A protein has these predicted regions:
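Active-site loop immediately N-terminal to the catalytic Tyr-X3-Lys motif
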Residues: 78, 90-91, 136
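Structural element of the ATP-grasp superfamily
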Residues: 11, 64, 97, 190-191
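Conserved active-site region of classical short-chain dehydrogenase/reductase
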Residues: 5-13, 91, 123-126, 130
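Gly/Ser/Thr-rich beta-alpha loop segments that engage phosphate groups in nucleotides
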Residues: 9, 36, 56, 87, ...
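C-terminal substrate-binding subdomain of Rossmann-fold SDR/epimerase-dehydratase oxidoreductases
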Residues: 95, 101-245
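The catalytic Tyr-centered alpha-helix of NAD(P)H-dependent dehydrogenases
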Residues: 49-56, 86, 90-94, 118-122
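N-terminal Rossmann-like NAD(P)+-binding domain of SDR-like oxidoreductases, especially those catalyzing
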Residues: 1-83, 152, 208, 213-218, ...
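Active-site proximal helix/loop that lines the substrate pocket
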Residues: 29-32, 82-88, 114, 134, ...
Length: 245
């Protein structure tokens, strides 16, 4: 949270105080909107962050918009759905399932497993960011999504099927505190105004991602500590300073 809030503020101040003529792309998150049972959030919908992380990201968004309006900084905000792909940190949902299943460990699913996330392959997200950097309008917000909505349990089952692992590896565990039910973004703005659309199918991207983790143990193994791979990491004791960084 410290990096998100003070880091964003420091960057904005540095640009303002040095009269730098540069464009800032502030990469936010769909979590600033909170969950939604029906429909999808648009860029001008009210923010209702439900976690400390989401609240800090929403605050950073407000800083960016304020500096654009007050000081004329060339700032654009993007809000993207859940990313997946190579080099994602092992604590994240998809990498954790792949790694634990590959090790023959139980695959933890929070609560009922019915929570829904909209997934986007990392390369689609990167191409959207590049397009916004080049052609986006200053002071605007752009939602980025691929409309690949799946329940968490379905994602786990798909991964196990691709890996030829048994479904009995799935283990339902205590739900995460403040676990939002469903995220969904309306990305019609970037599609219409900047002619962006996702290129990669979900199934192909998931297969590529699994293959990457299986072939690149050298990268993730030093990161995949017992704490990182823990089924319910929020119950563990963490260094308070690191959590605030």
């Amino acid at each position: 949270m410290k990096v998100i809030l003070l880091g964003t503020f420091n960057i904005l101040e540095a640009i303002r105080n040095n009269n730098l003529n540069i464009r800032i792309i502030h990469v936010s998150t769909d979590e600033v909107y909170s969950d939604i049972l029906n429909g999808s959030y648009k860029e001008d919908d009210r923010l209702k962050p439900s976690s400390p992380y989401a609240a800090s990201k929403a605050s950073a968004d407000m800083f960016c918009l304020a500096y654009h309006r007050t000081y004329g900084l060339n700032v654009i905000i993007t809000r993207c759905s859940n990313n997946f792909g190579p080099y994602q940190f092992p604590e994240k949902f998809i990498p954790k399932i792949i790694i634990r299943a590959n090790m023959g460990l139980k695959v933890p699913i929070y609560g009922s497993g019915k929570n829904i996330r909209d997934w986007i392959y990392v390369l689609d997200h990167c191409e959207a960011l590049d397009l916004i950097l080049k052609n986006g309008k200053s002071g605007e917000i752009y939602n980025i999504s691929s409309n690949n909505e799946f329940e968490n349990i379905k994602i786990a089952e798909m991964i196990l099927d691709i890996m030829n692992k048994p479904k009995d590896l799935i283990e339902f565990v205590e739900d995460r505190p403040g676990h939002d039910i469903r995220y969904s973004l309306d990305s019609s703005k970037i599609r219409k105004e900047l002619n962006w659309k996702p290129k990669y199918s979900f199934k192909e991207s998931l297969e590529k991602t699994i293959e990457w983790y299986l072939n690149n143990e050298w990268w993730w193994k030093p990161l995949a500590t017992e704490k990182i791979l823990h089924p319910t990491p929020w119950k563990l004791k963490w260094d308070t300073l690191s959590l605030l960084s």
